């Protein structure tokens, strides 16, 4: 299957999942409960958590690279 189609489907799922509380249909329908078993609050905090982890890892890698390059210049 094409990657673009998979990414579009995941994005559509995420958007619907994050918009459920706005229309107050999160727990009203059993089909919705089956399709979206985790609370929509998780959909809001998930990108924040992933961004924090990404920035932390990027900063750590850049810091290690800067320290290593500085040590090589001194030797």
Swiss-Prot record:
GO CC field:
endoplasmic reticulum; endoplasmic reticulum membrane
According to the UniProt entry, its GO molecular function terms are: enzyme regulator activity
Tell me where in or outside the cell this protein is found: Membrane
InterPro entries, per the entry: DPM2
UniProt KW keywords: Membrane, Transmembrane, Transmembrane helix
Q: Name one GO biological process term.
A: dolichol phosphate mannose biosynthetic process
Record field: transmembrane: 5-25, 42-62
Identify its membrane topology class. Multi-pass membrane protein
- Broad class of the protein's primary localization: membrane
Full protein name: Uncharacterized protein YIL102C-A
Organism, per UniProt?
A: Saccharomyces cerevisiae (strain ATCC 204508 / S288c) (Baker's yeast)
């Amino acid at each position: 299957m094409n990657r673009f189609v998979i990414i579009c489907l995941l994005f559509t799922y995420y958007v619907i999942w994050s918009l459920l509380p706005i229309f107050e249909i999160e727990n009203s329908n059993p089909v919705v409960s089956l399709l979206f078993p985790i609370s929509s609050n998780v959909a809001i905090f998930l990108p924040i958590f992933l961004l924090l982890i990404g920035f932390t890892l990027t900063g750590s890698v850049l810091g290690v690279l800067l320290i290593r390059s500085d040590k090589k210049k001194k030797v």
